[in-house]
Amino acid sequence: MTSFEDADTEETVTCLQMTVYHPGQLQCGIFQSISFNREKLPSSEVVKFGRNSNICHYTFQDKQVSRVQFSLQLFKKFNSSVLSFEIKNMSKKTNLIVDSRELGYLNKMDLPYRCMVRFGEYQFLMEKEDGESLEFFETQFILSPRSLLQENNWPPHRPIPEYGTYSLCSSQSSSPTEMDENES
């Protein structure tokens, strides 16, 4: 037997690829704390996203983001060998939109294999690659130069600012907006 035959087979690892976009990403450095490469994490870890670097694994440099915006947790469905992700909205101020479903504070759902996650002006295209390992999973971030909604033909959803005003880094559309007769 050769050393090749004796070598342990390496397990593949489940990976969640997240393509991210925000209109102010270049001017404001919103994603500057995020490493745009693959990162291996223990499968027991609850991964939190938000602006508080003491609590969150992935932080956004934006005061409009909640201290903890949302969390992802890996799990295995009963009688299944496939690992899945669960997403939970941790923000009391802003709903999290997964595809077309709105999640309020503490609402959670299974993350589809491919979906769009949005809050405010943030857009995340999340795509899962299955793996065999039960010990670890990986995350990978990719920065998109343009809106993911337009690029992937997702239904539009108007961003809702937390406090009724946009931050300096938010983009404001100069195109006409359709309004109801009773709106001012």
Curated annotation (Swiss-Prot):
The membrane-spanning stretches of this chain are none
**SUPFAM superfamilies noted in UniProt:** SMAD/FHA domain (SSF49879)
Function, as annotated, reads: Adapter molecule that plays a key role in the activation of pro-inflammatory NF-kappa-B signaling following detection of bacterial pathogen-associated molecular pattern metabolites (PAMPs). Promotes activation of an innate immune response by inducing the oligomerization and polyubiquitination of TRAF6, which leads to the activation of TAK1 and IKK through a proteasome-independent mechanism.
Family assignment from sequence similarity? Belongs to the TIFA family.
Phosphoprotein keyword on record: yes
Assembly and oligomerization? Homooligomer; homooligomerizes following phosphorylation at Thr-9. Interacts with IRAK1, TRAF2 and TRAF6. Interacts with TIFAB; binding to TIFAB inhibits TRAF6 activation, possibly by inducing a conformational change in TIFA. Interacts with ZCCHC11; binding to ZCCHC11 suppresses the TRAF6-dependent activation of NF-kappa-B.
What CDD domains does the entry give? FHA_TIFA
Q: Could you list this entry's UniProt keywords, alphabetically sorted.
A: Cytoplasm, Immunity, Innate immunity, Phosphoprotein
User: GO cellular component terms?
Assistant: cytoplasm; cytosol
* Species whose genome carries this gene: Homo sapiens (Human)
This protein's source sits in the domain of life called Eukaryota
Annotated FHA domain ranges read 47-103
User: Which GO BP terms sit in this record?
Assistant: cytoplasmic pattern recognition receptor signaling pathway; innate immune response; positive regulation of canonical NF-kappaB signal transduction; protein homooligomerization; tumor necrosis factor-mediated signaling pathway
Q: Where is this region: Disordered?
A: 165-184
Q: What free text does the record give on domains?
A: The FHA domain recognizes and binds phosphorylated Thr-9, promoting homooligomerization and subsequent activation of NF-kappa-B.
Q: Where in the cell is it found?
A: Cytoplasm
PTM remark: Phosphorylated at Thr-9 following detection of ADP-D-glycero-beta-D-manno-heptose (ADP-Heptose) by ALPK1. Phosphorylation at Thr-9 by ALPK1 leads to the formation of an intermolecular binding between the FHA domain and phosphorylated Thr-9, promoting TIFA oligomerization and TIFA-mediated NF-kappa-B activation.
Composition bias type Polar residues, residue spans? 167-177
In the record, which positions carry Phosphothreonine? Answer: 9
Write down what this protein is called. TRAF-interacting protein with FHA domain-containing protein A
